Amino acid sequence: MLDAFSRVVVNSDAKAAYVGGSDLQALKSFIADGNKRLDAVNSIVSNASCMVSDAVSGMICENPGLISPGGNCYTNRRMAACLRDGEIILRYVSYALLAGDASVLEDRCLNGLKETYIALGVPTNSSIRAVSIMKAQAVAFITNTATERKMSFAAGDCTSLASEVASYFDRVGAAIS
């Protein structure tokens, strides 16, 4: 996993060049938006349990067969596994948002996820739906448009962070499908 700083150093080193110009400007911007980024990550991790349980509940409401005998969320053990997977995905999305880099998400969460779900017989459309619900929740928290819970954020526009976190959830959905 490379954070924004490591990425700039590695790229400059590969070119045998000093860090400068647009790379320095990008780092200045990253630092300037640091408090907003930390607030965005905090809004996700502070609401993680609710986000995951709401996403799984929404997925089940749309597909009640999941909790019927033979369904993938039938029995407490399977439901717990579903909730655990949602927590893991959300945790790695928050890591990626904190670092400003998707490599930790790709390497430690998404690599082999589809194959694992296929082997376990997990319905991909339901998993993708739960991920899309978490995406909507994360964007709402970051843009402070969640109706039930408002978070305090550093001053400024957070739409770029909302777009960034949405792209991480899109990567998860693409990896599962």
Swiss-Prot record:
Record SUPFAM superfamilies: Globin-like (SSF46458)
Positions contributing to (2R,3E)-phycoerythrobilin 2 binding: C158
Keyword Transit peptide on entry: no
Binding positions ((2R,3E)-phycoerythrobilin 1): C82
PTM summary: Contains two covalently linked phycoerythrobilin chromophores and one covalently linked phycourobilin chromophore.
GO cellular component: chloroplast thylakoid membrane; phycobilisome
Compartments reported by the entry: Plastid, Chloroplast thylakoid membrane
Residue numbers bearing the N4-methylasparagine modification: N72
Record-listed phycourobilin binding positions: C50, C61
Topology versus the membrane: Peripheral membrane protein
GO biological process, one term: photosynthesis
Thylakoid among keywords: yes
Keywords attached to this entry: Antenna complex, Bile pigment, Chloroplast, Chromophore, Electron transport, Membrane, Methylation, Photosynthesis, Phycobilisome, Plastid, Thylakoid, Transport
Family membership noted in the UniProt record: Belongs to the phycobiliprotein family.
Function: Light-harvesting photosynthetic bile pigment-protein from the phycobiliprotein complex.
Subunit structure: Heteromer of 6 alpha, 6 beta and one gamma chain.
Protein's recorded name: B-phycoerythrin beta chain
Organism of derivation: Porphyridium purpureum (Red alga)
